[in-house]
Structures are given as structure tokens and as C-alpha cells.
């Protein structure tokens, strides 16, 4: 426990005395009081470079008063690396530490096929063509296609767990998934594509009607994923209780809207 008691002060000619309360704070990690070089506890005097890096009184003379951290930071700040997707056409270069941020938004990032027994991965538009040619019939492809912002019927068996659909305006696959749990059936929708501006952003609405009662779930922003997860979602889902299920068939309606093009 670190404590600090501020002294009493006097104000004005009347000698008014103002006492400030004692304040205390708790240090949760004592390791921050160790020298980052030798890992021994810091003691006075403590040496600090102009960039804020610390060294204890024993280490500073050994380093000839030169900060060991600053040169490495300068090196990292001067390293430009190419995108891992350069073999697929990306020409972007970025600072070493920005790699993960760029990969999430790179239009050339690979997306995995949502079919469980398929190991194909490719650009989201190539994945669209692959899925069309490899995994479905022409009749299914025609049936499970709709226009953006227009609600359409998307019935699916709970045991199927996943249904792939698309919109006329985009070469993008959308995954409608359901998960049976003890409290009911979770239904969620995701866009199989990277988080690139070129892909666009989508909102969606799911509705489920039973005995003339309708449940509606609206999401202002659909999640974009490069690989579909088959684990029960923790957020962004509609939950249909078991007492509202009448069969294995989920008779739902779905509407997807591209929000990035709206004024």
C-alpha cells in the first residue's frame, strides 16, 4: 500500500486552514518496480531516457549511459514488410507491427470453404465460384438466391446446422447457422469475407413465426468471418425457445441489406 499525506495549508489573512484527506493506492503488479534490464528492484537514483525507458543505477554505467531499447524501437519503426497475401496479388507494404491489422482488412485474405469435408481456401470471390461449382446443384443455387433488402423465406432443418445463401448483387457467400442447446435453438448469420472496405457492410433481420406469433431479430452489422465457426455463438444471435418449436424445420425469413451504400 502506497500512501501520501498532503500537508495542511493556510489561505487568506484569517488563517483559514484546509485539510486534504489522506489518499491511498494499491499497486497490483510489483514487477513494474523492477529494472527492465537486470530485473532487480529499482532503487534511487533511477535513470530514464527521453523516450521514457528506465535503467537502474547499476545498469546505466554498464550501458555507457545509452538506452538499449531506443535502437531496437528505431529498427522496428524502419522495417517495411510485404503482405503475406502478396502471392495472391496484394501489393501493400506496412510497418512490422501493423501486420495483424492489415491482414484482417486485406481484400486478398483467404477464406475457408464452409463445407465440413472441404479444405479449400481462396479469395472470397473465388470461394463463391468454388462453392457454386463443387458443393451444390443448379436448382439449389437458383433457389437460395435473393435480392438485397427484400425478405425471403429461408427454411432449414435444425439438423443441417448450416445453410449457404447469396444475394444477386454480390459474389459473397452468407452462412445461416442454427445450434440446438438446452435452452433452445440459436440462429445466426455471417458473411464469409474479410473485413475489407471493398466487401461492404451488411445488416440483417431474421423473423420466425409460430401460431401467428412472430419473433424478430435485427442486427445493425453482420459479422464478417474468413472461416465459419461451428461453436454456439456468444453474441449476435436469435434464440428460439424449445416451446416455440413445432418440428425439425425452422421456417424463418431473412433479409440482408448492404448498409455501406446507404446515404
From Swiss-Prot:
UniProt-listed SUPFAM superfamilies: TRAF domain-like (SSF49599)
Reactions listed under catalytic activity: S-ubiquitinyl-[E2 ubiquitin-conjugating enzyme]-L-cysteine + [acceptor protein]-L-lysine = [E2 ubiquitin-conjugating enzyme]-L-cysteine + N(6)-ubiquitinyl-[acceptor protein]-L-lysine
Organism: Arabidopsis thaliana
Protein's name in the database: E3 ubiquitin-protein ligase SINA-like 8
This protein's record includes keyword Transferase: yes
GO biological process: protein ubiquitination
Residue numbers spanned by region SBD: 75-261
Broadest EC class assigned to this enzyme: transferase
Similarity-based family: Belongs to the SINA (Seven in absentia) family.
Keywords: Metal-binding, Transferase, Ubl conjugation pathway, Zinc, Zinc-finger
Pathway entry: Protein modification; protein ubiquitination
CDD domains: RING-HC_SIAHs
ZnF locations on chain (SIAH-type): 78-136
Free-text comment on this protein's domains from its UniProt entry: The RING-type zinc finger domain is essential for ubiquitin ligase activity. The SBD domain (substrate-binding domain) mediates the homodimerization and the interaction with substrate proteins. It is related to the TRAF family.
InterPro entries: Sina-like_RING, SINL_plant, Znf_RING/FYVE/PHD, Znf_SIAH
Source lineage: Eukaryota, Viridiplantae, Streptophyta, Embryophyta, Tracheophyta
Gene3D superfamilies linked to this entry: Zinc/RING finger domain, C3HC4 (zinc finger)
One MF annotation (Gene Ontology) recorded for this entry: zinc ion binding
Annotated positions binding Zn(2+) 2: 113, 118, 130, 135
Domain of life: Eukaryota
UniProt xrefs under Pfam families: Sina_RING (PF21362), Sina_ZnF (PF21361)
Residues that hold Zn(2+) 1 according to the record: 83, 90, 102, 106
EC id: 2.3.2.27
Function according to Swiss-Prot or TrEMBL: E3 ubiquitin-protein ligase that mediates ubiquitination and subsequent proteasomal degradation of target proteins. E3 ubiquitin ligases accept ubiquitin from an E2 ubiquitin-conjugating enzyme in the form of a thioester and then directly transfers the ubiquitin to targeted substrates. It probably triggers the ubiquitin-mediated degradation of different substrates.
ZnF start-end (RING-type): 35-71
Keyword Transferase listed: yes
